[in-house]
């Protein structure tokens, strides 16, 4: 039988207090862990889903970019798509914004590797959003149902609206399947 001494009572009391403290801290950490699954759809004042006029205004106001207005906007021959390409200052070398039906669905920022290294950016993302869903030496990807963020080597960060992007992929598959069918019909005529 264990003899209960004042030391034993202090040890038992300390153990119980430590146990309660550890579990109360863990309970407080739980919301932060669930927040890691929410990926940002925004960098500074630039966000997925914003319209072209708001994008141009935000780029003009942001000191990280050297936006030259409409000279940096190109219309793409693809359905209602346009591309905004601009240079950056210091940390950002170049930035690309692809719009469909007037809304941004891809933002890509090529960072200056003389100032910022891949490892630091990767660690920041991992600390904030957890481990990537996909990882290889060339790309790290974090994903939710709505958003995909990738860090690509040497150092480009891409934000993609997955809903719009998947619609484009599905449409291109339909176009391609129609072309395949017409091709086969043509070949069958011989």
What are these regions (language model features)?
Residues 11, 29-38, 49, 81-83, ...:
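Residue-level detector of functional hotspots within protein domains
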Residues 2, 86, 129-133:
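Short linear motifs in intrinsically disordered
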Residues 73-116:
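Mid-chain, structured segments of secreted extracytoplasmic proteins
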Residues 28-72, 108-190:
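Non-cytosolic coordination micro-motifs
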């Amino acid at each position: 039988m264990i003899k209960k001494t004042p030391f034993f009572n202090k040890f038992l009391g300390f153990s119980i207090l430590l146990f309660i403290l550890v579990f109360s801290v863990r309970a407080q950490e739980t919301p932060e862990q669930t927040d890691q699954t929410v990926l940002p759809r925004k960098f500074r004042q630039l966000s997925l889903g914003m319209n072209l006029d708001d994008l141009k205004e935000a780029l003009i106001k942001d000191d990280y970019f050297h936006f030259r207005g409409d000279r940096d906007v190109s219309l793409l021959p693809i359905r209602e798509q346009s591309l905004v390409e601009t240079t950056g200052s210091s940390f950002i070398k170049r930035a690309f914004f692809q719009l469909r039906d007037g809304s941004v669905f891809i933002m890509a920022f090529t960072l200056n590797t003389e100032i910022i290294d891949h490892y630091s950016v990767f660690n920041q993302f991992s600390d904030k959003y957890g481990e990537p869903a996909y990882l290889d030496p060339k790309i790290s990807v974090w994903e939710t149902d709505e958003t995909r963020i990738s860090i690509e080597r040497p150092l480009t960060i891409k934000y993609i609206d997955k809903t719009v992007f998947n619609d484009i992929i599905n449409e291109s598959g339909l176009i391609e399947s129609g072309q395949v069918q017409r091709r086969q019909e043509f070949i069958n005529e011989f």
